[in-house]
């Protein structure tokens, strides 16, 4: 991986087969794939690699259990396949990780539906290559695994498997792999314009945020992998505002592991038909996430008091003697999911929007 100054010098004098705008996990993956096939590739990122949504996750490589409720079976199976592939190809980055979904008293129908859903999830997982299966837990076993859960609230639970990773480390590993294949990567470079020649993007107009200098990069094709900033880059070509991406805000809070005693990660159903994760991470607990339409500054999403209170209330609904308060919160972070809004969809209802990837072939490719 060469120095930034050398990468800048190369960018000024070369014509690349592909310029990738965006240094998150999507841009890194595109660059790695293209470079491994022999293309000359340049990745441009306006801040740190992985600084956006890619570093604001719940650290999970999950198969999309909650997507089954929306009947997204094909997506769930695809996610399970990708999860198993990552575990096989990058065991130093992705490892098996188990969760417990508690069953609540007086909610027999939901408990049965959840058990059936996890059974289907296991079936999809097995067809994707995993051999493990879920396990039903009685109240005593669940109490030993997660003492903070109230025995008057929960009646047992079910244990299932997913995977976990360090999201930022994952991005940097893929970036470095792309470099090993010959890609050039530069951070702190802002894209200010896209020049067209014969109906195709031929130059990317850039601004070095360190030196303040402007320069252009010649290319044969360009990929916009900027997540929630997708529309900003697309509009550099079209010249007119067009909304393809709807940002959905996901907030997490962090509390000390001593504040809520659990020896396992939890997958908590909520009263508003969502799910909240409680994930042990680096001697602390991450609790999240929310899923709400966002209209604020996409460059600096912050957790709000209402969002933190919501997450606290979900966890507290499962406990009695280990109730959490704002005083227990040692940190928080928020990220924005770039969801594709299809014609006729309600932008406010982000939880119903598909998590599938779509590729738009814009004028100027």
Q: Which residue stretches match the model-derived regions?
A:
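A conserved short coil-to-beta-strand element within the FAD-binding core of flavoproteins
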Residues: 187-202
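Flavin (primarily FAD) binding-site architecture
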Residues: 224-239
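Extreme N-terminal leader/targeting segments of oxidoreductases
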Residues: 1-18, 33-37
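Glycine-rich FAD pyrophosphate-binding loop
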Residues: 35-56
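Dinucleotide-binding Rossmann-like beta1-alpha1 core, especially the glycine-rich loop
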Residues: 59-145
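C-terminal catalytic lobe of FAD-dependent flavoproteins
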Residues: 177, 235, 240-286, 292-365
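Core beta-strand elements of the Rossmann-like FAD/NAD(P) dinucleotide-binding domain
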Residues: 14-16, 211-221
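Helix-loop-beta segment of a Rossmann-like dinucleotide-binding subdomain
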Residues: 143-182, 203-205, 213-217, 290-299, ...
